[in-house]
Amino acid sequence: LEFRRVLFRSQLSVTDSIEGALSGTEIAVIAVPSVTMRDNASLISSYLSENSAIVCATKGIEISSGKRMTEVIREEVRAVPPSRIGALSGPNLAPEIASGKVSTATVAFEDESVGVSVQELFSSEVFRVYRSEDVTGVELGGALKNIIAIGAGFIDGADLGNNAKAAYITRGLHEITRLGVAMGARPDTFAGLSGMGDLIATCISPLSRNYRLGVGLASGKDLELVLGELGQTAEGVPTTQAAVQIAKGLDIDMPITSATYQVLLEGMEPVQAIRELMVRSL
């Protein structure tokens, strides 16, 4: 396991009891795979109240509905007001945070007072938290960047060079922003930590599971084998499926996302997908 040697601080305790973890809590953090979010949110609903707040740290989109994670939580945890359900996102490679390296993030809540409380709670000398009220933008930046990270892995795995990768990341950000704005986000959010910041970190680091997935596919391995080797959730796979359907419904052109979908689910070779992106109509 990636964090088996990480020591918890003495103030922390571990439990497998939902009631024990959440009973009387003011701020709950939920960080589970997106495909299990609805079930997990339903499980915790009876332990929270109108005075609770929920911080969602999952970066994904529900495939079946196309809904963001906070939307799913709001549907399942009715006791907590929607304005008190928000998201934490940013360039947060978990192993670096666990080892105490300097990191930053953005927390987004519609209720400003809750956002301030969460910001103050999470901030430390090595973890600086900024605040936003654009929950949609913060969530979508964190979710959609995983799609782009898979393609960044294609480029590095095929040794296509830094020029290609820089151009790809730039166009990827443009694509994320285009879909995000169509879904109700503010465009400037994607220039921040939960957009550009998260995108850069995830596209350049071997600590990124989605990046490693792309590298593995570019080496000729099939999807199931690479996912098995990762041994962890790669949110870019279900998010790609969801994003393709959302973009189709909104009539938004998403060439990078579509190319990634073709590799993941239709068997296209990664290098061929990159080539086809290069010869699209100008």
Where is each model-derived feature located?
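Internal alpha-helical scaffold of NAD(P)-dependent oxidoreductase catalytic cores
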Residues: 36, 47, 72, 76-84, ...
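General beta-strand structural signal in soluble alpha/beta enzymes
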Residues: 56, 83-89, 129-133, 191-192, ...
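Alpha-helix C-terminal capping/helix-to-coil transition sites in glycosyltransferase folds
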Residues: 2, 23-24, 50, 144, ...
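NAD(P)-dependent Rossmann-like dehydrogenase/reductase catalytic/cofactor-binding core
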Residues: 152-156, 181-191, 195-282
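Short, small-residue-biased leader/transition segments that mark boundaries at the very start
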Residues: 1-7
